[in-house]
Design a protein with these regions (language model features):
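Charge-rich, well-structured scaffold segments of protease-associated domains
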Residues: 1-32, 99-100, 104-253
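His/Glu-based metal-binding/catalytic segments typifying zinc-dependent metallopeptidases
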Residues: 32-89, 252-253
């Protein structure tokens, strides 16, 4: 357990120390750093459903376990995400929103932590298209690794997009605070942001594909859907999966 106090703004170190001592010293004593425990996931894959009868939309989350934030594949994983679902023109959003019209938006992201992270893709879709949407997600996952391997143009566009976004990380007081928090929380090198664009630029297709082969494994997939179970289960677009109803565990009726 470790506590960080990150302050940005028109102030001084002396002022921060004065008020932080008053606010926290009596409540919190200095403690040694304790590393995050090694967490063992349930047996994978996992397919869960929460039943909301009458829901006009289904919320879909599809996830994969991944490595810690400081893993050497971080930059390749970041570029992979940008291609797969990290931007408006990404593959998954283009498929489900623009081509199929199932959703207003479908995206992907990493939730990073010290030892174990999770890669997720998700959004809300019309209830009647729940299983069809899952089929398209499965298709995009498999094609990324086989018949539609990213080519140079797609790779370069993804990297350019990430680099173009970079200045926005410094545009406000709160965004600078987020940067400092990120460095502290993940124990990053102090020059991490100075080298970020260069490290993104160096990512190769081979590195992205190595991440894809390790990350996008159907055998380790985790799916959670929240919607009208009756409509979803009566859908003719079937995948070879059986959902576990966890409604009672999370919804009080």
């Amino acid at each position: 357990n470790e506590t960080f106090l990150i302050v940005t703004g028109n102030t001084t170190l002396e002022e921060i120390e004065k008020y932080s001592d008053q606010a926290f010293r009596q409540k919190y004593n200095a403690i040694d750093r304790k590393h995050s425990p090694n967490i063992e996931l349930e047996k994978l894959p996992i397919y869960n459903i929460i039943d909301l009868p009458g829901a006009p939309q289904t919320v879909i989350r599809v996830g994969f376990p991944w490595k810690g934030r400081k893993d050497s594949q971080y930059y390749a994983a970041t570029v992979l995400n940008q291609i797969f679902g990290g931007q408006f023109t990404s593959r998954i959003n283009t498929n489900l929103r623009q081509d199929k019209g199932y959703t207003y938006g479908f995206h992907s992201w990493f939730d990073w932590s010290e030892n174990h992270s999770i890669y997720s893709t998700g959004g809300s879709v019309q209830t009647s298209t729940t299983m069809a949407s899952l089929q398209e997600i499965y298709k995009e996952i498999e094609e990324f690794k086989t018949s539609r391997i990213p080519q140079k143009e797609e790779l370069e566009e993804a990297k350019s997009s990430l680099i173009r976004q970079y200045p926005s990380a410094f545009e406000s007081n709160s965004s600078v605070n987020n940067i400092l928090t990120n460095i502290a929380l993940h124990n990053l090198e102090t020059d991490y942001y100075q080298n970020y664009c260069q490290n993104i630029e160096k990512v190769t297709i081979d590195e992205v594909m190595q991440v894809a082969k390790e990350l996008l494994s159907i055998q380790s997939i985790i799916i959670l859907i929240v919607g009208d179970k009756t409509i979803i289960e009566n859908d003719n677009n079937k995948l070879d999966i059986t959902f576990t109803d966890i409604t009672e565990k999370y919804i009080q009726k």
